[in-house]
Amino acid sequence: MSPHPGDRVRVERADVTNEGILMPSSTSDHLVIKLDGGYNVGIDRADASIDLVTSDAYDIGGTQTDIGSSAGAGADTEADKTESDITSKSAASAVAFDESLPTVSLISTGGTIASTVDYRTGAVTAQFDAEDVLRAVPDLAGRANYRGRVVRNILSENMTPAVWQDLAAAVADEIRAGADGVVVMHGTDTMQYSASALSYMLDTPVPVVFTGSQRSADRPSSDNVMNAVCAVEAATADISGVFVCMHASTADDTCALHRGTRVRKNHTSRRDAFKTVGATPIGKIEYDTETVSFHRDHAARESTELNLTSELNEDVMLLTFTPGMNIDRQTAFLTDSTPDGLIIAGTGLGHVHTEFIPTVAELVADGVVVAMTSQCIEGRVCDRVYDTGRDLLEAGVVEAGDTLPGTAKVKLMWALANHPDPTNAMRKSLAGELQHRSVPWE
């Protein structure tokens, strides 16, 4: 009898032996084995010896499929589908509703934390109701009542302003429907941009908490469970606004709660990649004790009424100045395209090559809002110290203080579409992005 998915098997090929759980494969030419360490390994079936160790050692769900089948071949992908494209399950869930618990809406946009492998097809599924969530993260049970919703199922590098608008509308819908908090599951690469966007689009009376995962669920070092649990705890806390909740350190003990407009992904792969820039995090969540504490002033729950202002002007560019930049080429491009807004990430206190200043003056004269940020991680722009800075101010550049460059771009997109004076808006803090005082750097 041939082994089936879920059986424990021993596979020998080319003098290498692997033992683990047989998983369904998307092709008939390869075996997929989940090793005891949690990782999956693919093995070419040619010349492989397969021995059954234990039957039904692992419940993977779905219909059993013989190892020779190709159930996943040609399966449709859920990537890039919109909310209306995705077939949802019944709103009714087998998960009992507990009136003593708060209600948290879990919204998925894709990314590592929200990805679930459908082993019957080999595809990533976008099904995302309360049962799916609790099946993936059992530790969430008993903390809240959950509603699941998919806005997109995309890699975060494919995020667009249009998706931000759909996401903001979905969050607003969930709050109107009675959610006590919202958790947005999002890929980590562009999470800071999406959190910034919703910070401007939404006045929210409840916490809206972005979270994600640096390591996928099949890896022993995955951070998905702790991040999801801590995000739910933050979403039920006495606070309002838009935040990011991720590992505070490499240990599995605490998550940091960052303001959506002050957070930055500072490492490509570490679990504690996200940091609040220029300040301490808003708060922290202790994983073991489920304690949420706050380090800084924050708006209390229900301290504002829900308001959605989601219009964006996408004609905003972010230009990072570098030595050797072809100024003639940049000038020709900018003056020909004439964006509505330009964010410059300048050097140091906010500088560019002096030969680029006339280009800035020309853009401002044409009605372009030009704001200056710094490439430096810490500190703030001050163009009143050196001649170059003073010349930039005379040319019409707006100092954006210590606003992060990416946040500044999103802010200007929103301000151009919604604020009566976008230039002046860049000088003010609209969503906690601009601090009046930079804390000492350690």
UniProtKB/Swiss-Prot annotation:
Domain of life of the organism encoding this protein: Archaea
Record carries keyword Ligase: yes
EC id: 6.3.5.-
Disordered: annotated span: 63-84
Annotated InterPro entries: AsnA_fam, Asp/glu_Ase-like_sf, Asparaginase/glutaminase-like, Asparaginase/glutaminase_AS1, Asparaginase/glutaminase_AS2, Asparaginase_C, GatD, GatD_N
SMART domains cross-referenced by the UniProt entry: Asparaginase (SM00870)
GO molecular function ontology, one term from the record: ATP binding
Reaction(s) catalysed (UniProt annotation): L-glutamyl-tRNA(Gln) + L-glutamine + ATP + H2O = L-glutaminyl-tRNA(Gln) + L-glutamate + ADP + phosphate + H(+)
Transmembrane feature ranges: none
UniProt keywords, alphabetically: ATP-binding, Ligase, Nucleotide-binding, Protein biosynthesis
An annotated GO BP: regulation of translational fidelity
Domain Asparaginase/glutaminase: start-end pairs: 102-429
Active site: T112, T188, D189, K265
Subunit structure: Heterodimer of GatD and GatE.
Similarity annotation: Belongs to the asparaginase 1 family. GatD subfamily.
Role according to the record: Allows the formation of correctly charged Gln-tRNA(Gln) through the transamidation of misacylated Glu-tRNA(Gln) in organisms which lack glutaminyl-tRNA synthetase. The reaction takes place in the presence of glutamine and ATP through an activated gamma-phospho-Glu-tRNA(Gln). The GatDE system is specific for glutamate and does not act on aspartate.
NCBIfam families hit by this protein: asnASE_I, gatD_arch, PRK04183.1
Protein name (Swiss-Prot/TrEMBL): Glutamyl-tRNA(Gln) amidotransferase subunit D
Organism name: Haloquadratum walsbyi (strain DSM 16790 / HBSQ001)
